[in-house]
Amino acid sequence: MQIIHTIRELRTWRENIGKVAFVPTMGNLHEGHLALVREARKRADNVVVSIFVNRLQFGQGEDFDKYPRTLQQDADKLAAEGVAVVFAPDEKELYPNVEQRYNVEPPHLQNELCGKFRPGHFRGVATVVSKLFNIVLPDVACFGKKDYQQLAVIKGLTEDLNFDIEIVPVDTGRAADGLALSSRNRYLSVGERAEAPRLYRELQAVAESLKQAGLDYAGLERQAADHLTAAGWLVDYVEIRRADTLEMARAGDKKLVVLAAARLGTTRLIDNVEVGLP
């Protein structure tokens, strides 16, 4: 496995390589990331994993400075999974100008759900992913469903900007108690970690109610948010949306997703549950 730090070196490697599957990450890899890598390995012999903590997708007061940087440990895990290349550029390599002069602006989605609470986040995601797509030139790229809104943004930009890349969604990795795997779980105290699976349970409860012909979407959303608030969470949102577009759900929609974001102590957690109705 090679660890490559420059765009020029990666492009030289890419010239003589066939099909490539790509997994973009910010490092501090856990089992959820490795599940993406394993899916990528099924799709192509050559897998590239990027490790880059992208300043553009962090807002003021967020955890950019304390986000864990664990390149050597990550590289060891990826080597064991048969990854061909780790692309680990520094900030000046990916953003040679003091500021990124041109950005990819997602449409309405960047101001809804998580975008409402993290201004500029999805612009940062869309911009860095577009840059990485242009650098790596993958045939396939794998993204986790835990970041459901991010996945929708990536699907949209891939289609609208004519990237010839197959986007592969991968199911959310979970701990035994249901908590979605996340690099930020390490911020949780022991007590918070014990409480954290409640988020998934509340979303599951909403999903079950929807399957029982529960069309009072606002009531179900409010009930789940109230349960979380009563347990000490600070809720950003619980919302039921169309799974394909993340537009507001309406009666008659068959494929839905229940999404939530909430803070437990100082840690912001997100999760979602897909729902298929008959």
UniProtKB/Swiss-Prot annotation:
Q: Which CDD domains match?
A: PanC
Primary location recorded for the protein, binned into one broad class: cytoplasm
The annotated active site, in chain numbering, is H33 (proton donor)
Task: Give the top-rank taxon of the lineage listed in the UniProt record for this protein.
Answer: Bacteria
Name the positions where ATP binds: 26-33, 144-147, 173, 181-184
Query: By its UniProt entry, which InterPro entries does this protein fall under?
Result: Cyt_trans-like (IPR004821), Pantoate_ligase (IPR003721), Pantoate_ligase_C (IPR042176), Rossmann-like_a/b/a_fold (IPR014729)
**In which compartments does the protein localize?**
Cytoplasm
Name the residues that bind beta-alanine.
Q57
Q: Name one Pfam family in it.
A: Pantoate_ligase
Q: Does the keyword Magnesium apply?
A: no
Miscellaneous comment text of the record: The reaction proceeds by a bi uni uni bi ping pong mechanism.
Q: What does this protein do?
A: Catalyzes the condensation of pantoate with beta-alanine in an ATP-dependent reaction via a pantoyl-adenylate intermediate.
Family label: Belongs to the pantothenate synthetase family.
Q: How does it assemble?
A: Homodimer.
Task: Specify the protein name.
Answer: Pantothenate synthetase
Species in which this protein is naturally found: Neisseria gonorrhoeae (strain ATCC 700825 / FA 1090)
